[in-house]
Swiss-Prot record:
It comes from Colwellia psychrerythraea (strain 34H / ATCC BAA-681) (Vibrio psychroerythus). The modification Phosphoserine is found at S102. PANTHER family: PHOSPHOGLUCOMUTASE (ALPHA-D-GLUCOSE-1,6-BISPHOSPHATE-DEPENDENT), PHOSPHOHEXOSE MUTASE. Activated by phosphorylation. This is Phosphoglucosamine mutase. Mg(2+) binds at S102, D241, D243, D245. One of its GO terms (biological process) is UDP-N-acetylglucosamine biosynthetic process.
Amino acid sequence: MSDRKYFGTDGIRGLVGQYPITPEFVMKLGYAAGKVLAGQGTKKVLIGKDTRISGYMLESALEAGFSAAGIDVGLLGPMPTPGIAYLTKTFRAEAGIVISASHNPFYDNGIKFFSNTGEKLPDAVELAIEAELDNPMGCVESAKLGKASRVNDAAGRYIEFCKSNFPSKISLKDLTIVVDCAHGATYHIAPNVFRELGATVIEIGTAPNGTNINQGCGATSMAAISKAVVEHKADLGIALDGDGDRIMMVDHTGYVIDGDEIIYIIACNDLKTGRKEGGVVGTLMSNMGLELALKELDIEFARSNVGDRHVMELLREKGWQLGAENSGHVINLNHTSTGDGIIAALNVLTAVTKQEKSLFELRQGLTMLPQLLVNVRFSGQNNPLNDADVLAAVDEVNETLTGRGRVLLRKSGTEPLIRVMVEGPDMDEVTLLANKIADLVKLVK
């Protein structure tokens, strides 16, 4: 595939006010995307955003660019990323555009695209947009300018879609659930979904102010929800990230349940209810314990590269339905076309209610191996992944853990980080080995 100038593993992302996340570039991006999509006969796209203060500015810039290309725009307002994917399909729009930097701090933002099937835009279309960005921005004649309008019932439509994915003959009336929306795009949606299905809902992270998204709350900061579940004597907790495509859960003891354990619970329930369809896709970061537990159930397991895009690609290749990253991107193609935190939570709650077991009980079949992920910020000229000392240390650790664990070293696709992951049977040993490699990565300039 050709080298990409702008699109990363999850669209275009960066610091607001610095290229490419500037009003000027984003307007030109809207125009370039509009030109490419117009060549496919497009007349309408949808734009949604999370709750970052910069979302208003970038939404206006995109709207102007698409209008200049002659494309009509439907403005969804604050909307979870999977909700934008769903509405893109139901509105028969040619594309859905998400303004979000997901789990990143408020001062970052990004743009990514969904196709008319609610999936991430094909590589060929992204590359065509990149090529168009190299051309001067123009404008269609006045009579052909695109129009923009607000989609006033967007949240209600998505709430009803989520509820339709929960069995109609059962209720959540016996459950008390803490829901943490990370002050993000699900703040006005997730609590209503679970409440309308009968649950008693305790909300946290549902007061966005433009700058508090993901701040000390949500799926990337679990201390608050763990404490709330225990204090309120709740049955469980559901934590979503800023754009709603990532989920973590908490059982009644405050124990944090990640994407590996969530997909295990869903796969087990599918097996028990006769809905098992193929295997499960994880990633290079998935805990070895998941692989072993699924093997015990005679469920196939395959690893993709890190990133929900790669999980989706491998699911399509194998014709399977279930995939997840341990970071909380959970995909169930029986229900959605992309990772969806609310839908994943409903899949788990289906298991809780149908099996009449607590979340604590449902996770007992999976024994997670101790795993440590060390993130090393990196801005040097040389690539640590090619450094001789780092590679020698990785080989040494792999030899030490032969048959008992593994080591993985990779670059983040969205931030200037080198991720060092070590997994093994003993946490003290894992910590020692991970820090040994991380210290060498820090020395690379």
